[in-house]
Each structure stands twice: as C-alpha cells, then as structure tokens.
Amino acid sequence: MNFQPLGKRVLVKRVEETKTTASGIIIPDNAKEKPLMGEVVAVSKEITDIANGDKIMFAKYGGTEIKLDNNEYLVLNLDDILGILK
C-alpha cells in the first residue's frame, strides 16, 4: 500500500536500537524507550529539504503512529523533525 503524506508531513520508519547494553545486559521490549531516529519513507510535495532515505531525529512526543501492511510507521509534522543525520 502506498501512502503519500499531505501538508508539511513525512512518513518515517523508526530505526531499531540495540537490545543489549554495553555490558551485555538484554533490555526487554517493555523497558525500552521508542527510538527518536528514523528513516524517511515518504515526503509530502510541500517539503523540499528532506528526501526519501534521509535519516532524521525527531521530537519525543511528535507524530502519529500508523500501521501499513503490518509495518509500523510514524507520520511527523515538519516542525517535529529536529534534524537530518549525515
């Protein structure tokens, strides 16, 4: 299923973080915070400085979670994006 964000929004797939600490302790899923980084999957036509495939950091409480084809995504407003990782 294709999803085209409208307005000044982007569709993001969260980047999974490691499930163990530096000392090797396994962190259970319910104890982990959701990552604040992701990869841009789709961009609205109004946004020109962010492209598909960009890695971004976003605000902790920003965005709306959606599920498409059994995958979880986040729809973010442009204002919730903190920066592009290069």
UniProtKB/Swiss-Prot annotation:
SUPFAM superfamilies per record: GroES-like (SSF50129)
Localization per record: Cytoplasm
Family matches, as InterPro entries: Chaperonin_GroES, Chaperonin_GroES_sf, GroES-like_sf
Biological processes, Gene Ontology terms: chaperone cofactor-dependent protein refolding
CDD domains: cpn10
Highest taxon listed in the record's lineage: Bacteria
Any Gene Ontology CC annotation: cytoplasm
Molecular function in Gene Ontology: ATP binding; metal ion binding; protein folding chaperone; protein-folding chaperone binding; unfolded protein binding
Principal location class: cytoplasm
HAMAP family in UniProt: CH10
PANTHER family: 10 KDA HEAT SHOCK PROTEIN, CO-CHAPERONIN GROES
Name assigned to this protein: Co-chaperonin GroES
Protein species of origin: Campylobacter jejuni subsp. doylei (strain ATCC BAA-1458 / RM4099 / 269.97)
Upper lineage: Bacteria, Pseudomonadati, Campylobacterota, Epsilonproteobacteria, Campylobacterales
